[in-house]
UniProtKB/Swiss-Prot annotation:
This is Small ribosomal subunit protein uS14. Its cofactor is Zn(2+). Zn(2+) binds at residues 24, 27, 40, 43. Part of the 30S ribosomal subunit. Contacts proteins S3 and S10. Binds 16S rRNA, required for the assembly of 30S particles and may also be responsible for determining the conformation of the 16S rRNA at the A site. Belongs to the universal ribosomal protein uS14 family. Zinc-binding uS14 subfamily. GO terms for molecular function: rRNA binding; structural constituent of ribosome; zinc ion binding. The lineage of its organism: Bacteria, Bacillati, Bacillota, Clostridia, Eubacteriales. The keyword Zinc applies. The gene is rpsZ. Keywords: Metal-binding, Ribonucleoprotein, Ribosomal protein, RNA-binding, rRNA-binding, Zinc. HAMAP family: Ribosomal_uS14_2_B. The keyword Transferase does not apply. PANTHER family: 30S RIBOSOMAL PROTEIN S14, SMALL RIBOSOMAL SUBUNIT PROTEIN US14M. GO terms for biological process: translation.
Length: 61
């Protein structure tokens, strides 16, 4: 079990706000994050395939 001081330190607000990481809002994945949509590439692909993201469709050229 952690010391009470270590628990308080972990729960304290961060000293530097820049250290925050972007994570997917659906699954919490830290990599492959698409800032415009706020989700990772895998969740984006699934939602786009089901047509749940308005304005997104499969590209063809």
């Amino acid at each position: 079990m952690a010391k009470k001081s270590m628990i308080n330190k972990a729960n304290a607000p961060q000293k530097f706000t820049v250290r925050g990481h972007n994570r997917c809002k659906l699954c919490g994945r830290p990599h492959g994050y698409m800032r415009k949509f706020g989700i990772c590439r895998i969740c984006f692909r699934e939602l786009a395939y089901r047509g749940e993201i308005p304005g997104v469709k499969k590209a063809s050229w």
